[in-house]
Design a protein with these regions (language model features):
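Active-site alpha-helical elements of protease catalytic centers
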Residues: 97-110
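Surface-exposed patches in mature extracellular/periplasmic domains of secreted proteins
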Residues: 122, 198-206, 267-275
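Metal-dependent peptidase/peptidase-like ectodomains
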Residues: 2-4, 9-29, 119, 129-231
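His/Asp/Glu-rich mid-to-C-terminal helical/loop segments that flank catalytic regions of hydrolases
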Residues: 16, 112, 116, 232-282
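Soluble metallo-hydrolase cores and metallopeptidase-like ectodomains found primarily
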Residues: 2-96, 112, 116, 121, ...
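Short acidic, glycine/proline-rich loop/turn micro-motifs
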Residues: 87-94, 168-171, 236-239
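Beta-strand segments within the central parallel beta-sheet cores of soluble alpha/beta enzyme folds
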Residues: 75-79, 121-130, 156-158, 272-275
Length: 282
């Protein structure tokens, strides 16, 4: 039996493991699955003690100002959340190697790559956000209280979350060509994938609203989410670094760098397009 706060929900949620379910069913003299599977109107009463603690969390932001006097006011954002689940009741630490040390470390590598060269025309912002696991809180605060100078405009977000597992030659991309938020940003991402020998897949739209890029998209900012998919260690203490495919994570990082570099030099910032099923078959 475990209790979860339900992310940003204020309603505690109870999850019953099979063993707990069977014990409750046995108390009700229901001894087989066929019996308790047919019962209607069985009511259970639970007393739950919830201790809430409010803490301060911080976004970490770094900005490389663009070299063009006008285009420098157009900002390409790289985002990744650095928070995870902390310490469990049993004292085990949820290190979150894939979720999301993989994405947050990729941002550090991308920042170093940009720093090694001359600044591109548009500005580059590296955004490590907190509070993702509690309901995308850090990214929501950032887009609602944009701390940049007033003249600077966010024109794209490239979000990396869980990029180090599953198929070594594929990376999930959302929004897909059939999604209402499909944009020229996604087309450029497909080209970057080809340059790095990765196949983009478009079967992860169900996760579009579950990561930080969604808060940018809600503000009308073209956004893309690079995501290798969930696995058996998702939100478990077993999500450790020895299971990361570092070669794949590095390739996805290079895809993201190429994409941002292209956007920073493009004549026009990315724009949303109508869903295009033909592009999805590329």
């Amino acid at each position: 039996l475990s209790m979860n706060s339900g992310g940003s929900s204020q309603i505690p949620t109870i999850y019953l493991e099979d063993s707990a379910r069977d014990q409750i069913a046995a108390i009700a003299t229901l001894t087989t699955e066929s019996e308790y599977g047919e019962v209607a109107g069985l009511i259970g009463t639970f007393n739950i003690e919830v201790e809430r603690k409010q803490v301060d969390a911080f976004n970490v932001v770094s900005l490389m100002k663009g070299s063009d006097p006008e285009l420098a006011n157009e900002v390409i954002v790289y985002s990744a959340h650095y928070d995870h689940l902390g310490v469990g009741r049993d004292g085990n630490i949820y290190n979150g190697a894939d979720d999301n040390a993989s994405g947050s470390s990729a941002l550090i590598e991308i920042a170093e790559a940009f720093a090694e060269g001359s600044a591109p025309p548009r500005s580059i912002l590296i955004l490590h956000v907190s509070g993702e696991e509690k309901g995308l809180l850090g990214s929501r605060w950032f887009v609602e209280h944009n701390p940049l100078p007033e003249q600077m405009k966010l024109v794209a977000d490239i979000n990396l979350d869980m990029i180090g597992r599953n198929n070594p030659t594929q990376i999930g991309i959302t929004p897909s060509p059939e999604h209402e938020h499909w944009s020229s940003l996604n087309e450029a991402a497909a080209d970057a994938c080809e340059e790095e020998g990765l196949e983009p897949t478009y079967d992860v739209d169900s996760f579009y609203g579950r990561t930080d890029s969604y808060n940018f998209a809600k503000q009308g900012i073209p956004a893309i989410f690079l995501f290798a998919g969930v696995h058996e260690d998702y939100h478990r203490v077993s999500d450790e670094s020895d299971k990361i495919n570092f070669t794949k994570a590095a390739a996805v990082s290079r895809v993201a760098f190429r994409l941002g570099w292209h956007l920073a030099w493009a004549k026009q910032p990315p724009v949303r397009k109508s869903p295009n099923s033909e592009t999805g078959n590329r």
